[in-house]
Amino acid sequence: ADLAGIETVRANIAKVNPGAKVVDAASTLRLQDPSVVDGKRVLAVEDGPTLTHGGMKIGAGVVAAQKYGATEFVDPRPYLVGKLQETFEIYPNIGTILPAMGYGEEQLRDLEATINATDCDAVVVGTPIDLARVVKIEKPHTRVFYDLQEIGEPNLDGILDEFVSNSDLG
């Protein structure tokens, strides 16, 4: 978020819960294997609700793949299978990102078929789960991880230590 967005969140927190402790942090992204996307034409698979209901134009996979040298994002629309075709009809502004719309049997089957049919060099997985555990990705692929980088104090360790001390848990 930009500074104005952060200040809006701070003001809302103060309004709703004036005594709340706020931890400043950055969410940094890293890839399991950056070499998979470097210089490659990449298919980005992202968290579906983030793109559809959330209206985001990019997700963690796109950001990380750009950071690590992807040269192009391949459009999955010509390769869509099953319910994913309906998803793009309902949400035509998704663009060139493939949303993982759920983890039911049919959804996973459609997602797997679409990924494997897409003409790309590599796949970047920006979903909250390890997608390769539930679908067979037949192309080189790598997963995005999020790391929390706390900035200053208060920090989570200090807040939890205080809570434990004050709660007779320690």
Residue ranges and their predicted role:
Residues A1-V22, V134:
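Conserved C-terminal guanine-recognition region of P-loop GTPase G domains, centered on the G4
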Residues N17-G170:
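P-loop NTP-binding site
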